[in-house]
């Protein structure tokens, strides 16, 4: 949400606000740096969506001198600048409040936090209009029904969604220009920050940061706001906190949990660490392109199997783009591991020839880590190919003339794949398609397409997303 006048003293989405230094903090104290390389009223660490709004409101509405530190070498923007760019439009505050209490079950989320979210969320369009964002208000998000669990008490009709044309990329360009107009400085290539804390009062008075290979000190006279995003690209944190592993992501590769480490160093406590707004997609298994890709099959000629080669789900109804990962948390004691993580998407030449399996540059849904609006230094790849062949050539999709050969190649990637089991699964699936009924998982008859047109293909499916 877009935080209003309280941004300099309270949390905004994806950020944490830390109190500034006291007036009697003398430079002679040992815990203070001998000198400051930069000084400001309000220090914002991270220039994604939360950092963008914190800096704008801090300077424009609160009248503070703001300095922003950004990890990326240029531009910044975070996930907010390469995703759909949607934001909530609250229609019924009391319904929304009831919904949040039902969804959180009043566990670990204080009512004051919910109330603050709603109070400021009611002003989203006000702030969007003030800063001249373009948007349309719709009753359904690109990702589907809103709110996510609208069947809960209070959920139905409590909110709409604002969709900006050009997605988050266009909104970022508008707001970044507003930031420049306000004279807010952003320092790029900033990393490895450590907060500077008064050991007696516990106040945060600034930070140290590496800019390139040089350590710099930054003094914050009024406060520090951490807007450093999540830990999508920190394997240790994902393994430690998330509810299954491996978990793979596309999106902003600089999200490595830096702010979480900073807070822990000064005695901060963590909460909600096992939560993720994510679905599932294809992991490339490519060290040079180490990210997830959202697959949008142009045809329904495919199935999902678990790691052992067994089909486990109605592939058309795994979950929404924000909760689809839940289906991958199944633990199998027979292998002492998560048997849906990874899963495999198995298909044949019919799907391969049906069209591109993901988004290309120039498509209507061109957003993510390949968009042409990203500078070369930040763009991870050039988007999906027109005919799917480049992804086979790179090894992202494996190919074989027979199911047995395909299963053998899959087993080279995951030892738990069983050749005989996968062959039996495909045979059973083809019989299901011939019968026109899926008695085990009840997939829609209109989508029951056999896998009998060689060659055959497969790719790994992991929980995760943007």
Q: Where do the language-model regions lie?
A:
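N-terminal export signals
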Residues: 1-21
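Beta1/beta-strand and adjacent pyrophosphate-binding region of the FAD-binding site
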Residues: 36-48
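Core beta-strand elements of the Rossmann-like FAD/NAD(P) dinucleotide-binding domain
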Residues: 38-40, 214-223
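Glycine-rich FAD pyrophosphate-binding loop
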Residues: 61-80
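Conserved redox-cofactor binding core of oxidoreductases
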Residues: 76, 119-215, 235-236, 283, ...
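Glycine-rich active-site loop/strand segments that organize a redox cofactor
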Residues: 87-117
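Glycine-rich loop(s) and the adjacent beta-strand/alpha-helix scaffold that form part
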Residues: 219-286
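An anion/pyrophosphate-binding glycine-rich loop and adjacent beta-alpha core
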Residues: 260, 269-412
């Amino acid at each position: 949400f877009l935080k209003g006048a309280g941004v300099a003293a309270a949390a905004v989405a994806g950020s944490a606000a830390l109190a500034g230094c006291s007036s009697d903090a003398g430079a002679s104290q040992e815990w203070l740096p001998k000198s400051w390389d930069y000084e400001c009223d309000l220090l914002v660490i991270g220039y994604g969506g939360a950092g963008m709004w914190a800096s704008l409101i801090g300077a424009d509405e609160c009248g503070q001198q703001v300095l922003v530190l950004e990890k990326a070498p240029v531009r910044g923007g975070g996930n907010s600048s390469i995703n759909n760019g949607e934001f909530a439009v609250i229609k019924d505050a009391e319904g929304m409040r009831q919904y949040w209490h039902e969804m959180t079950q009043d566990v670990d989320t204080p009512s004051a936090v919910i109330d603050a979210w709603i109070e400021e969320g009611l002003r989203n369009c006000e702030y969007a209009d003030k800063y001249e964002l373009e948007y349309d208000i719709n009753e359904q998000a690109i990702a589907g029904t809103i709110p996510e669990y609208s069947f809960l008490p209070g959920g139905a009709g409590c909110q709409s969604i604002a969709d900006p044309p050009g997605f988050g990329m266009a909104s970022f360009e508008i707001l970044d220009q507003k930031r420049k107009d306000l004279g807010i400085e952003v320092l790029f290539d900033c990393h490895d920050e450590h907060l500077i804390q008064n050991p007696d009062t516990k106040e945060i008075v600034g930070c140290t940061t590496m800019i390139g290979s040089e350590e710099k000190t930054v003094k914050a006279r009024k406060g520090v706001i951490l807007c450093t995003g999540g830990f999508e690209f920190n394997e240790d944190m994902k393994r430690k906190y998330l509810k299954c592993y491996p978990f793979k992501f596309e999106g902003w590769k600089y999200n490595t949990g830096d702010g979480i480490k900073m807070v822990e160093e000064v005695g901060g406590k963590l909460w909600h660490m096992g939560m993720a707004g994510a679905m599932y997609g294809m992991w490339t298994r490519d060290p040079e392109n180490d990210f997830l890709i959202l697959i949008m099959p142009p045809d329904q000629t495919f199935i999902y199997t678990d790691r052992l080669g067994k089909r486990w789900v109605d592939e058309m109804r795994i979950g929404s783009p924000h909760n689809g990962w839940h289906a991958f948390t199944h633990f199998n004691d027979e292998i002492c591991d998560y048997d849906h993580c990874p899963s495999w998407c198995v298909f044949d030449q019919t799907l391969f020839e049906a069209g591109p399996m993901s988004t290309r540059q120039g498509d209507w849904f061109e957003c993510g880590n390949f968009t042409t609006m990203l500078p070369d230094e930040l763009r991870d790849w050039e988007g999906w190919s027109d005919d799917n062949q480049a992804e086979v050539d790179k090894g992202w999709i494996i190919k074989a003339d027979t199911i047995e050969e395909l299963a053998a190649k899959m087993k080279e990637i995951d030892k738990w794949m069983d050749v005989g089991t996968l062959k039996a699964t495909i045979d059973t699936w083809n019989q299901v398609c011939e019968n026109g009924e899926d008695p085990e998982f009840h997939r829609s008859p209109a989508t029951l397409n056999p896998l009998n047109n060689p060659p055959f293909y497969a790719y790994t499916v992991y929980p995760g997303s943007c």
